[in-house]
């Protein structure tokens, strides 16, 4: 994982150095730090009364000081980041699915109910899409965009700008690993057109606006509002629109905005194929942007494989439910889940040639290179 604002460690160090209350707690040895799941589980258990302070590997791997092979905190990484464990309490790392590790709810009508599953949101979406076996991948199109590719029981260390992470770690099984590619701006680019350019009143209207024109009219929009994440990792890139002419209409910019996420997804998938040595056969999708048929068809065209959209798209919540259910015997094996949520699936198939896809991608790559350095 490259040093960036993405992992937790930089935020922890900044807080210690810049926030007096955090610094004071650190000096006293009373500071506790973990990812948001650890805080939620701690609070749901009643806070200091029970003091259940735990996290699972899919979340802890994002701190940047967990060893993804041992699934425990790495002393060398802790030393590198100057993290003194005598002054900072870190959550215990436990299985993603466990009948006792996460405690019980301390209040509300569900008081006494066990918490039996915990996953990072993208790992939960992969599980919810039933990406249990190597070679399966999902892409969540939300405010940002997150693509996870299951690589199996051994981590694949990326050399092409991706994150090597823990997908999930269920009891009775070996942990499963994934390659992840993150796009900083996806659905938020539609919000930008709505709020800043006033192109639309509601975000779902973006597809209709984009379909007012046949293509992007030569417009390319690199939506690098805060730099570019995987596989580029260009911190000083900024949002840039190329190819505007007197002919350009709002629909062209709307279409180019939707295409930006699709181009970045293709770049990530290309990197995943290089890292894993295997070509993906299909892509499962979820998240708000996947409701746009135009966007999903564009995605299929660019990556040259089928894009599968389930009818029930709350796959992140479903994945969390699977983790919890496995711990208490709702399902005995993952095989029991393979046919769940398959009815009503929409499949988008490529409609352009590989050559046309490559031509479009070449233009996008050129635009990415030209948007470097604008924050300096």
Language-model segment annotations:
Residues 58-174, 184-188, 201-216, 282, ...:
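ATP-dependent carbohydrate kinase catalytic cores
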Residues 1-122, 178-179, 186, 190, ...:
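Gly/Ser/Thr-rich active-site cleft segment
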Residues 21-24, 34, 47-51, 149-376:
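Glycine/Thr-rich phosphate-binding loops that ligate phosphate moieties of nucleotide
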Residues 12, 126, 265-269:
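Generic hydrophobic alpha-helical segments
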Residues 1-3, 112-118, 136-138, 326-340:
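A polyampholytic, Gly/Pro-enriched intrinsically disordered region
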């Amino acid at each position: 994982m490259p040093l960036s604002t993405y992992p937790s460690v930089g935020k922890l160090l900044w807080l210690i150095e810049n926030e007096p209350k955090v610094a004071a707690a650190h000096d006293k040895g009373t500071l506790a730090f973990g990812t948001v799941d650890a805080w939620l589980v701690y609070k749901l258990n009643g806070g200091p009364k029970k003091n259940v302070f735990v996290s699972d590997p899919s979340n802890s791997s994002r701190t940047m000081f967990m060893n993804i092979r041992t699934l425990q905190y790495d002393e060398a990484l802790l030393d590198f980041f100057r993290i003194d464990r005598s002054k900072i309490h870190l959550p215990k790392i436990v299985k993603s699915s466990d009948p006792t590790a996460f405690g019980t709810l301390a209040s509300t009508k569900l008081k006494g109910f066990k918490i039996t599953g915990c996953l990072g949101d993208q790992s939960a979406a992969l599980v919810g899409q039933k990406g249990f076996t190597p070679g399966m991948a999902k892409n969540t199109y939300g405010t940002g965009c997150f693509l996870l590719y299951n690589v199996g029981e051994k981590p694949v260390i990326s050399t092409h700008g991706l994150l090597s992470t823990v997908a999930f770690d269920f009891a009775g099984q070996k942990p499963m690993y994934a390659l992840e590619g993150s796009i900083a701006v996806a659905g938020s680019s539609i919000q930008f057109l709505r709020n800043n350019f006033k192109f639309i009143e509601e975000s779902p209207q973006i597809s209709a606006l984009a379909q007012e024109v046949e293509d992007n009219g030569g417009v390319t929009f690199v939506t690098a509002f805060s730099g570019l994440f995987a596989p580029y990792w260009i911190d000083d890139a900024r949002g840039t629109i190329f190819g505007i002419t007197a002919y350009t209409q709002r629909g062209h910019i709307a279409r180019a905005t939707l295409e930006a996420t699709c181009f970045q997804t293709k770049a990530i998938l290309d990197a995943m194929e290089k890292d894993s040595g295997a070509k993906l056969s299909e892509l499962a999708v979820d998240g708000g942007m996947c409701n746009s048929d135009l966007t999903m068809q564009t995605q299929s065209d660019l990556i040259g494989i089928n894009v599968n959209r389930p009818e029930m798209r709350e796959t992140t919540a479903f994945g969390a439910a699977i983790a919890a259910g496995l711990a208490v015997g709702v399902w005995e094996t993952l095989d029991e889940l393979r046919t769940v949520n398959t009815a009503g699936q929409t499949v988008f198939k490529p409609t352009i040639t590989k050559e046309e896809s490559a031509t479009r991608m070449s233009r996008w790559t050129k635009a990415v290179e030209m948007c470097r350095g604008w924050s300096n």
